[in-house]
Amino acid sequence: AIYSQLGQDVGVSVEPCRRDTFPAIVLSVAYLKDVLGVAEDEPIVICPVDPYVETAYFQALQALCDRAGESGANLVLMGIEPTYPSEKYGYIIPETADDLSRVTMFREKPTKEAAEEYIAKGALWNGGVFAFRLGYVLKRAHELIDFTAEDQL
């Protein structure tokens, strides 16, 4: 879907086998740094590629990328306004109701009752769209992954 919307010149990293989100991101970030020479202060956006989206989505991705580069935040998330209390999504609880806000709490796939409470507090669904500076994820990867242990690679 991404090539049909953006053309063949866009760079896409595909994980060689399923190892969950963080290892896939680390693989992509390592490729960007080691193969393409991307600087560690460069903002990177992570997003699902399966949905068909409108042009406004890409404008929002650019704003997210800009915010990651300018704000000094380690991670910038894009939330989705919930339409019902779901146990299938993570919830982002923002500090304020502004379009841009610090996150006070994040809860992954809560019970329906907890989701109702979060929505009442102005929570947003985590849509899996976020941005960060490349160096931040490299630093976290080296803190969390033992790159000398074969079973972790």
Protein language model regions, located:
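Conserved N-terminal catalytic core of the sugar/cofactor nucleotidyltransferase
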Residues: 1-46, 52-59
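Short coil/turn connectors at secondary-structure junctions
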Residues: 8-9, 40-42, 70-75, 87-88, ...
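A short acidic, often aromatic-flanked loop/helix-cap motif at beta-alpha or helix-coil junctions
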Residues: 18-23, 83-86, 112-113
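Short acidic, glycine/serine/threonine-rich loops at helix termini
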Residues: 40, 56-59, 87-91, 142-143
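Short beta-strand segments
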Residues: 45-48, 77-81, 107, 131
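Conserved donor-nucleotide/metal-binding helix-loop-beta segment in metal-dependent transferases, i.e.
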Residues: 52-87
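Catalytic core of tubulin tyrosine ligase-like
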Residues: 91-153
